[in-house]
Amino acid sequence: MYSDNSQRKLTKAVTLSTLKKMKADKEKITCLTSYDASFTNVMNVAGVETILVGDSLGMVIQGQDSTLPVTIEDMCYHTAAVKRGNTNAFILADMSFMSYSKPEQALDNAAKLMQAGANMVKLEGGSWLADTIKLLSQRGIPVCAHLGLTPQSVHKFGGYKVQGKSQDAADLLLQESLDLVAAGADILLYECIPTELGKTLTDAVPVPTIGIGAGHHTDGQVLVMHDMLGINLGHTPKFVKNFLTEGRNVTEAFEAYVKEVKDMTFPGPEHGFKS
């Protein structure tokens, strides 16, 4: 999949089949958020296999205090921009808050994101999403289900807190994972869960798992681009590492991230959570 040059540029398109094979081969999957054409192009050069057009743009681009104000129109705009800068990476696009509260509504909005250039849509939630995921899957729309800490539910959680710490909570996450895979989810993304739970869940499901603050056992890793470049508003989550250090430029920072995820040196123990 990679060329022989030091930049590890992707030489052919990454597909869902590619990601499933990477899980089977135990090759780590790399993912970063991007919101425009320019950074997307650099990520392709650096060899990042998957790009997430995240609703995190509400915070890092728009300056909001959460992801809730982001609209489906915002997501379509940025997905189209990312598509224009992309060559071979696999593009995931977030469905914004309340854009998938009903299955038919979700289908309409997911179609907009796919038409804008997404290869897959991502939804936050548990087993209640099963009917929605089943409908999207039946209509040919690949789905990534986001479990654990789901930022669109931040007010219900009472803040950005680690999820799945108790045995009951861990058991619930496992059951929800199995329910959503049975409904047709093609990828599961876990956020802010204990490292060992990340391993349990990854071993239990047949689809690729991507983690952010979920330890090193998940099949892949994702970070918000601004966080891993040290561009933030004063708060750096525990699971983040600044790769724009040691005199690196942006391309080198992305390359270092890819290398450390592949080598399984990132995330380290200091980036994970305990039960």
Swiss-Prot record:
UniProt record, GO biological process: pantothenate biosynthetic process
Major location (coarse):
cytoplasm
Q: Where does Mg(2+) bind?
A: D55, D94, E124
Query: Where do the annotations place 3-methyl-2-oxobutanoate binding?
Result: D55, S56, D94, K122
Q: What is its EC number?
A: 2.1.2.11
Cellular localization per UniProt: Cytoplasm
Highest taxon of the lineage: Bacteria
Q: Spell out the Pfam families in the cross-references.
A: Pantoate_transf
Q: In which pathway does it act?
A: Cofactor biosynthesis; (R)-pantothenate biosynthesis; (R)-pantoate from 3-methyl-2-oxobutanoate: step 1/2
Q: How is the cofactor bound?
A: Binds 1 Mg(2+) ion per subunit.
Keywords from the named record? Cytoplasm, Magnesium, Metal-binding, Pantothenate biosynthesis, Transferase
The GO molecular function terms of this record are:
3-methyl-2-oxobutanoate hydroxymethyltransferase activity; magnesium ion binding
Q: InterPro entries under this entry?
A: Pantoate_hydroxy_MeTrfase (IPR003700), Pyrv/PenolPyrv_kinase-like_dom (IPR015813), Pyrv_kinase-like_dom_sf (IPR040442)
Essential cofactor(s): Mg(2+)
Q: Which reaction does it catalyse?
A: 3-methyl-2-oxobutanoate + (6R)-5,10-methylene-5,6,7,8-tetrahydrofolate + H2O = 2-dehydropantoate + (6S)-5,6,7,8-tetrahydrofolate
Residues at the active site:
E191
Q: Record's Gene Ontology CC terms?
A: cytoplasm
HAMAP family, per database record = PanB (MF_00156)
Subunit info here reads: Homodecamer; pentamer of dimers.
* Free-text function comment from the UniProt entry: Catalyzes the reversible reaction in which hydroxymethyl group from 5,10-methylenetetrahydrofolate is transferred onto alpha-ketoisovalerate to form ketopantoate.
Under NCBIfam families, the record lists: panB (TIGR00222), PRK00311.1 (NF001452)
Which PANTHER family does the protein's record reference? 3-METHYL-2-OXOBUTANOATE HYDROXYMETHYLTRANSFERASE (PTHR20881:SF0)
The record's comment on protein family reads: Belongs to the PanB family.
| Name of this protein | 3-methyl-2-oxobutanoate hydroxymethyltransferase
The primary gene name is panB
